[in-house]
Amino acid sequence: MKKYLLINLVLLLLFNCLHADNWPAWRGENATGSTDSGTYPSELNLNKNLLWKAVLPDKGCSTPIVWENSIFLTSPLNGKDTVLSFSMDGERKWQTPIGPERKGKHRNGSGSNPSVVTNGKSLYALFKSGILVCLNFSGKIIWQKDLSGYGKDTLYWDFGTSPILSSKHLIVALMRKGNSWLLAFDQTTGEVVWKKERNFQTPPECDHSYATPTLINHDGREAILVWGAERLSAHSSKDGEMFWVSTGFNPKQKKNWVVVGSQVVAADVVIVPYGRGTHMTGIRMGGTGDITETHRLWTRTDTGCFVPSPSVAHGRVYILRDRGEVHCIDPKTGRSHWEEAFPRASSSYYGSPTVAGSKLYAPREDGVILIADVAEGFTFLGEFDMGERIIASPVPVNEKILIRGEENLFLFGG
């Protein structure tokens, strides 16, 4: 326990060293989909507190990232996978075409689903086409790799796993039937540092995963948490060796239990959504080998999320279910602090919720953002229509909210 407290203190110091306004990866700097401090807007009204709107070139679903005064995202442009940069005043700074686009199949998918990730020096982007690219902050390509050599993309839908950064490497997970890999690349050169196969026998589609890995610490060592193929595993970031694994998520061997929503970490517990939104479990981190029987703290079959990933804020886990129910649970016990719901609608929630200060922002696929104050329970504040479909997650930055729609990028102030 003392070792985990020390690790958490080190992580906190590292995060505080980052620019306060940075959102350097899909779910933010600590992969929780939240920022605890600040006062964020109670409404996202196009006629009242919209600061600017910038036109996007085509349909892309990646959540933008922010570093200081720059916004970075991916999108198709004239049939090409493209990385774009905007300033915080909405001006398009540059756009860099990377290679031929591989179009999305799902109505809420695209060839540009994964988010860019940055260490403040370089940008890294991955596309459904299999192209992995590193650029500088001026949009110049530093290196580029084609990952199609690691096997056919057998996912039924559109690749959505975002790359992440460890202290030394760029980490990519490819999780599909028959050719699943965990890969580490040198951040500077793009050379493969290590690669580990991650193939297991499962019922149909249960080895498909769209989840993004999480960087954690295992007994003082940097580790990568991977969720897919009915297994949660922790691997050394140094060489990919597996520290521990938890199984038993699908004892009845049901078909099509694909992983879409990602795991989150809260209070040294991994919160794992599974069973197509019907199950959720809490697993204590640590141990060695198979920890299935020793580290599972709780399991619930009355809550969960299928496509959206949970958020963690204020020591609690916030679950946005596909039909708009919102559950706030204790990560150590799995018990609900409260269970509420946004107003019902025919559309579902595909984007993940974001907690900024005391506000929870929930993007619905039809382009409506719903907001609740969760400081003390759940107080519904309103719903705000962007006028276009939204799949990306809201991004909080400097007490403003950045929204990426299918056609436009929006920034709202207080």
How should each PLM-predicted stretch be described?
Residues 1-4:
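Positively charged n-region of N-terminal signal peptides that target proteins for export
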Residues 20-414:
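Noncatalytic, solvent-exposed loop/strand surfaces
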